[in-house]
Amino acid sequence: MLWELKKIWYRIYQKVFKVAMCFMDWSEPQLLEGAGSVLKLPEFIKSKGINKVLVVTDKGLMSLNLLDPLFKKLEEVGVEYVVYDGVQPNPTIPNIEECKDMYNQNNCQGIIAFGGGSSMDCAKAAGARVVKPKQSVRAMRGQLKVHKALPPFFAVPTTAGTGSETTVAAVVTDPETHEKNAINDTCLRPKYAVLDPELTVGLPPHITSTTGMDALTHAVEAYIGKSNTKETIKEAEQATKLIFDNIEEAYNNGKDLEARGNMLKGSYLAGRAFTHAYVGYVHAIAHNLGGLYGTPVSYTHLRAHETDSY
């Protein structure tokens, strides 16, 4: 009986929130697209009057020297940068606090999130802490609790999976409780994003496949969700086709820029779709397992049924 009442409440909440979403700011990111487009980003940043940025990434990408061309271009145009590379596969509250402190201590004026969904989630939450210094990360969890514009935010995905470059969410792990919770607010949606397939050509096949299935999960759950619209259904269909038509080629021939570019676009469209239409049970299970075991959400989507926890 209690569960039935909860279900009714959840459905009412979804219906009310679906109506409320019509009145929110859903401005999409301004995109830089195509091979080599990341090198256009520094001049674009400079044109916004920004002279110093915090680059949020992880040690793995730093060790691959994937950011070196971006760093060189930033130096050429006169934009200073500092690097936070402590992002973990499931960013934690301490990660976010360290990142926020580095931004403030170095008087940065903007944030570049460079990497997968973890880097972008960490950067989003850190940006929220910058503009809301008196509000803890735990207090931001849930719906619409930030409601203040982040510093200028530039998202550069290096995987075609999470779609975080266009979503309003940041998923955070609490190391004390091992829970994963989302901070959801339209102000977390990046204003600018770069879809550069050259940044994904070095992904090993197993990451190409798992992140691609993450994007496909977004598209399917957005398509069948209770809060979908004509627009999200169209975006989900486009995303599904792009992923189906290109994931095998991207897996077998990682240097195929067309396939890589189409996967990035599919991930982006899936991110747009589920931002409006929500995700579903697969994500709910995967986020809980990720909090318990520290597994990346893209991998957990495929393996949830094999774990003892469920």
Task: State the predicted function of each range.
Residues P94-D101, Q105-L195:
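Glycine/threonine-rich beta-strand-loop-alpha-helix active-site module
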Residues T300-T307:
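Conserved small/polar residues in nucleotide/adenosyl-binding loops
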Residues M62-K134, E249-R260:
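N-terminal small/polar loop signature for handling phosphorylated ligands or for N-terminal nucleophile
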Residues Q88, F114-G116, Y278-V279, P296-S298:
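Active-site nucleophile and cofactor-binding loops and adjacent substrate-binding regions
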Residues A169-A277:
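Carboxylate- and glycine-rich phosphate/diphosphate-binding segment that chelates Mg2+/Mn2+
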Residues M1-V79, V83-Y84:
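An N-terminal, well-structured beta->alpha segment
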Residues R272-Y281, A286-T295:
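Glycine-rich phosphate/pyrophosphate-binding beta-alpha loops
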